[in-house]
Amino acid sequence: YRGGGHFSGRLTAALCIAGGIAIQMLERNGIKVKAVLESVCGQESAIDELIAEAISEGDSLGGTIACTIEGLPCGVGEPMFDGLENRISQAVFAIPAIKAIEFGDGFKLSELKGSEARDEYMVSDGKINLTSNHNGGILGGISTREAVNFRVCIKPTPSISIPSKSVSYSRGENVELKVSGRHDPCIALRAVPCVEAAAALAVLDLMLGDINFSGRFVFND
């Protein structure tokens, strides 16, 4: 078979179509969703050369994607099961090959003290603002009006031309598995618009389901 079956990246086409509509609706309300490829195989430069080398070896590479949501008003989300982080994560993990997500400073927060990691409030020019954004624009599952930012990990596809070890269930013996077909050497390159789409859909769904936002949501220019 060609491609990855029900985990094929082709199936994200529908996600991107729906997400494209959500992105436009959010933009009309001053909210912008933008994702970028941050690194491939841990490197932020010479990416083309890395991918070319992987292709020549018949191997694949993982990568990281960073996403930012700007203009999101304060109060989007819920404190428990429908928190903003929860809903974004649920949508993002629908994208094949994503294995991890972190918001704000993410795992680096585990290395800090509370006095270093907390985002403090202060009044400036008559407005209440945060002095930092270590938590990625979300506190207690609810948006803080700061930019929401998160990063995702894309694993390298196991569908490569290098043979792998497997088993024959019917024969009860070890076999060598050879994969053929068309497979991307680095899925992360194609996953950028998918991450944007998933994030936009999650945010839009939360806002339309909240009477505090849905009543003043602009649907048309």
Where are these regions (language model features)?
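Glycine-rich, mobile lid/loop segments that gate access to catalytic sites or pores
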Residues: 1-80, 84
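Alpha-helical support elements that line or immediately flank enzyme active sites
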Residues: 10-35, 82, 86, 90, ...
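A short glycine/serine-rich beta->alpha loop
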Residues: 1-11, 74-78, 133-139, 182-193
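Internal helix-turn-beta structural module
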Residues: 159-221
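Glycine-rich anion/phosphate-binding loop at the beta-strand->alpha-helix junction
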Residues: 58-61, 65-174
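Flexible, glycine/charged-enriched surface loops at secondary-structure junctions
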Residues: 30-37, 54-65, 97-109, 210-219
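Generic hydrophobic-segment detector
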Residues: 4, 8, 48, 53, ...
